[in-house]
Each structure stands twice: as C-alpha cells, then as structure tokens.
C-alpha cells in the first residue's frame, strides 16, 4: 500500500514555503518562553561545566561531520544542510565562549542554544529547528514538579516528545 506520509521532496511545497516566509519575516517563533521564565523555572543542570563540555563536544562533532552531511544533502536536497548545521554549531560555540548560554538550568541552557541557532540559521530549516528547540524548553518547563530538581533522562525524554509534538503542528513530515 502507498505510504500516506509525505516525502522529503513533498515537504518543499506549501508548508515549507509558509514556514520560510515566517522565518524570513524577522519575527521570532511564537510561544517561546521568556528568558526570565526559563531562568526561574524548570529543572537544573546537575553540573554546569559538564553540560558545557557536552555541548562543545556535540558542536565539534557537527562541525567534523559537515562534509558528509553536505554530500548526502546534495543527493536528496539542495546541498546546504551541512553548512547550515556547521554555522549553527559555530554560533553555539561562540555563545558559550561569550557566556551567553546559561549553564545553571536546563531550560536556560536550551533557550541560549535556541538564541544562537536563531541568529545563525535562516530559511525553512532554521524555522523548524527553532520550533523544535522552543518546544524542548516548553517540555522541560512542563516536566518538572520541583524547580530545584536536576534534569534527568526522564525530563529530557518528556521534553523531546513535547518538542516533537510541537514540530508536528507545523509540518506534515513524520518519521518513516
């Protein structure tokens, strides 16, 4: 039977065009928690320095794999995915260097990463990543009963599920 889910190519049609128009309008993605809300709510990072090292390691891995991502994207897309992700990773590293990403609360950390991402990625992919990361912050805020507790795998899994559901409101693309 035919798969009812859209292909990546089909994603380039109307929903992607609408997202790109919104992304290029200069407006931030709506529903983004404020810095103040994120700084006072949600789970904490149990070890800020470890969190920083993990983020740095992930960014360096993205930078290292950029040529491979670009190669694959030239086959299935327009060839800019690797460069776009590398620019984002470089922006996150710069934000870390300038202490623009708070490391005390998981929500503040993701919000700082989101700001770096929004400053470095445009177009449809930039909008989609911003929606996902904003959903991740919202999910972290919803996942905690006690604002002082450290983020656990359970918090992150719940937040990631929330982010995925948020993204699903803006794009018909689904895994598979």
State what each model feature region is.
Residues 1-176:
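N-terminal loops that bind phosphate or other acidic moieties
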